[in-house]
Amino acid sequence: MIDLSIAQIADIVGGRLADITPDQAAETRVTGTVEFDSRAVTPGGLFLALPGARSDGHDFAAAAVCAGAVAVLAARPVGVPAIVVAPEPAVDSAASVLEHDTDGSGAAVLAALARLAAAVSAELVDGGLTIVGITGSSGKTSTKDLLAAVLAPLGEVVAPPGSFNNELGHPWTVLRATESTDYLVLEMSARHPGNIAELASIAPPSIAVVLNVGTAHLGEFGSREAIAATKAELPQAVPSSGVVILNVDDTAVAAMADQTAARVVRVGRTAGADVWAGPVTLDALARPRFTMHAAESQIDIALAVHGDHQVSNSLCAAAVALECGASMEQVAHALAAAGPVSKHRMQVATRGDGVTVINDAYNANPDSMQAGLKALVWMAREGGEKRRSWAILGEMAELGDDAISEHDRIGRLAVRLDVSRLIVVGTGRSMSAMHHGAVMEGSWGSESTMVANADAALALLRAELEAGDVVLVKASNAAGLGALADALVAEDVRR
């Protein structure tokens, strides 16, 4: 974060000082990071007192100061130097972050954090910072990681870790930027209409990327049209001096060209796009190879990430980098070196016994499930002798009334793609629908097996996995299959 005094921060967020005099607040500067976990506090930092599932950050204020924080942003006095903001009602857009906020204290601290991030981002933009916003139903984190890699040769980049893209992660990431930051890459998610507009108001992007409109969070939005309208809030937030990158292979995204005042750059797999990919091939590990065309130039691209779906992600990242002044050669080199960064997102590891594990267990929706299954069967059949393919699938959350039909569809798809073994993890109605769909599509014997939990799935794999098999582990994060995938990578086959 930029260097600010406690008094300046109090003025920005509209808070009052507690347990510190005005003179002390004017003299004491926040030179460290802003943290909501007292264990992560750095010397000179600012601690956010937020309510959590098991504890309230206000109870850890003293520990944070002992760890080096110079002040706490809180909703009540905490016995150590603090900026206190008045509690306020939690709003729907913050519900996912503040589900344990019973008195409005968390909503107040979060709103103050947003005001601080907005002030800091405005000052940094005046100093030359370029802000890039990314949204889409799937692929945001992978694209964010690719974009951070291709921008790195051009200057200092700040991007969120993992999928830290909500009402807390967004301003927290903004406050990671300093005067030396050239590019701030922000991933923007939404659970309700207005979420993306709210995030964009904190750090208005001069470059926006819209990847796709799918069915993630369909339960919250009710329709794909409502999802598209919310994703369109990002290009709508870009000024006429900015640039909007649209993946025109998705018709709902292509239609957003009429909803922005900014210049539009179209990317896709057809020659009519501004940045486009020629014929795509995949190697034995499903890593795409293609020729990228842009501005009457072309260059061969060999990606280090896995899956055909990464083509559009990489094109969007490339388009941003080209807009920022990168050469085609710089983009190609950076993409070739940019492997998976964020944990449990298409991480591919091959063990000593030849078993390949595709760990994509952080998140899942119907579109990303389909992409994962296609990558699985490709890896199993390429590179010589056909290998057995295993799909270890958990629940896709937040699909609302479509949950049963979408899980049924994925079970049927696994059979149509000729996945050798489908292990359905979980006992709810959605998981029963996935197993039933596979059986009705033509699965026989033990091709589709339903188990109660991740431990049961791991026990089955330990008993039946053979050298050379290929295993996809995928589910929404709440299913907890990431630990299963980690365990598979770490151990030998047990017969």
Could you tell me what each predicted segment is?
Residues 70-71, 182, 206, 420:
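Short acidic/polar active-site loop segments enriched in Thr and Asp
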Residues 98-248, 252-260, 463, 472, ...:
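Phosphate-binding loop of NTP-binding sites
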Residues 9, 45, 64, 116, ...:
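Residue-level signal for inorganic ion chemistry
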Residues 1-133, 143, 149, 451-463:
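Short, basic phosphate-binding NTP loop
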Residues 1-18, 40-46, 56-62, 81, ...:
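ATP-dependent carboxylate-amine ligase
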Residues 155-162, 268-269, 445-449:
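Conserved RecA-like helicase motor-core motifs
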Residues 33-35, 67-75, 243-247, 263-267, ...:
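Short, hydrophobic beta-strand segments that form beta-sheet elements in well-ordered domains
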Residues 177-180, 190-218, 254-298, 337-349:
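Extended acidic/charged loop-beta regions that coordinate divalent cations
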